[in-house]
């Protein structure tokens, strides 16, 4: 089944911050657009949806604009560079992060979740009768990295909006 993008702002079923057309337009101005244009539309859509899911694993300042919205943006009650976030649009840096992460995921589908651990370089450790053999080139099945560890450049796009890293247990304190 072909992937379908829903980029409705504050949408209950939204699964992307951008449309495929917006992403294609962005990469038309990119120095290395071939790493995007060599993908099928379905691969691009799947990568955009996946990028949104990973971006939404992070914790952000402010509040969702609508309790029923599926995605973490748009947000309000927070300013970046003295400008209040608006409920009527997605910040450009969030879109840029999605474009670049989608391209990265389209070109390395195992970068975050790892491979199954069946291929690659194996190491063996032996202690008496105990022997352990493991793969050094991949992660075990089900293992998930912090998105910012895998793609630290995302911090440049998302840092101004983030409360903490992925799965952060930090709490916002309001004095007054």
Roles of regions detected by a PLM:
Residues 1-176:
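Divalent metal-cofactor coordination and adjacent catalytic microenvironments
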């Amino acid at each position: 089944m072909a992937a379908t993008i829903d980029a409705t702002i504050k949408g209950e079923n939204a699964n992307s911050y951008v449309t495929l057309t917006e992403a294609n337009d962005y990469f038309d101005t990119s120095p290395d657009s071939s790493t995007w244009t060599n993908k099928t539309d379905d691969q691009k859509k799947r990568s955009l949806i996946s990028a949104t899911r990973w971006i939404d694993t992070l914790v952000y300042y402010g509040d969702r604009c609508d309790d029923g919205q599926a995605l973490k943006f748009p947000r309000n009650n927070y300013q970046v560079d003295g400008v209040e976030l608006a409920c009527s649009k997605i910040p450009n840096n969030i879109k840029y992060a999605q474009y670049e992460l989608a391209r990265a995921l389209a070109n390395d589908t195992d970068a975050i979740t790892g491979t199954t651990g069946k291929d690659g370089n194996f190491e063996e450790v032996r202690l008496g009768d105990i022997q352990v053999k493991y793969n050094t080139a991949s992660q075990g099945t089900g293992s998930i990295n912090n998105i910012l560890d895998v793609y630290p450049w995302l911090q440049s796009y998302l840092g101004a909006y983030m409360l903490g890293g992925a799965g952060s247990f930090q709490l916002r304190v309001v004095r007054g």
